From Swiss-Prot:
GO terms for molecular function: 4 iron, 4 sulfur cluster binding; metal ion binding. Pfam families: Fer4, Fer4_7. InterPro entries: 4Fe4S_Fe-S-bd, 4Fe4S_Fe_S_CS, NapF, PSI_iron-sulfur_center. [4Fe-4S] cluster 2 binds at residues 63, 84, 87, 90. [4Fe-4S] cluster 1 binds at residues 53, 56, 59, 94. This is Uncharacterized protein HI_1043. The keyword Lipid metabolism does not apply.
Length: 166
């Protein structure tokens, strides 16, 4: 039987964040709604976003990096040539509040590494790690999801195009 001493020893060797703890305490609050498209930062939950976004294009016009495109009358985020700096200009101009400055400034995109990655080929390449402004990529290419905001700096920096954002 596990007693208090066991848990104290366990916790002295393992860090548990508040988010991680609450994820297990309140599992029913976890959203089961999956994204169907990559959305701009500061977007509402996918079900609300899909219902509220009217495809007006104000966010696309406001994006200084030209990363927001309209697909099927909905705003999508396309990080191909520049990262998202999470400036919030898209959220400031959204007339329907599908994007709003009070929503999380996270694109919810996370890097995926292909076999072309030099680190996976046992070569030295710290480019994605050093490019990440939040230091969310470890030397073993593990992503710290609590730090990562999906900006795409890692993808843009990768000169072998081994990173996709999903």
């Amino acid at each position: 039987m596990k007693n208090e001493a066991y848990y104290q020893a366990y916790l002295s060797h393992h860090h548990i964040s508040r988010r991680g703890l609450l994820r297990h305490v309140f599992p029913a609050t976890k959203s089961t709604i999956e994204k169907t498209q990559s959305r701009p930062p500061f977007s509402a939950r996918e079900d609300l976003f899909s219902a509220v976004c009217n495809g007006c294009g104000e966010c696309a016009s406001a994006c200084p990096n030209g990363l927001i495109q309209l697909k099927q009358q909905q705003a999508t985020l396309e990080i191909d040539y520049a990262p998202c700096d999470l400036c919030g200009k898209c959220a400031e101009v959204c007339p329907t509040n599908a994007l709003h400055p009070n929503f999380p400034g996270d694109t919810l995109l996370r890097p995926q590494f292909s076999s072309a990655c030099l680190i996976l080929q046992n070569q030295t390449c710290p480019d994605c790690q050093t490019a990440c402004p939040l230091q969310a990529i470890s030397s073993t290419l593990e992503i710290d999801n609590e730090r990562c905001n999906g900006c795409g700096e890692c993808k843009i920096t990768c000169f072998v195009a081994a990173i996709t954002l999903k």
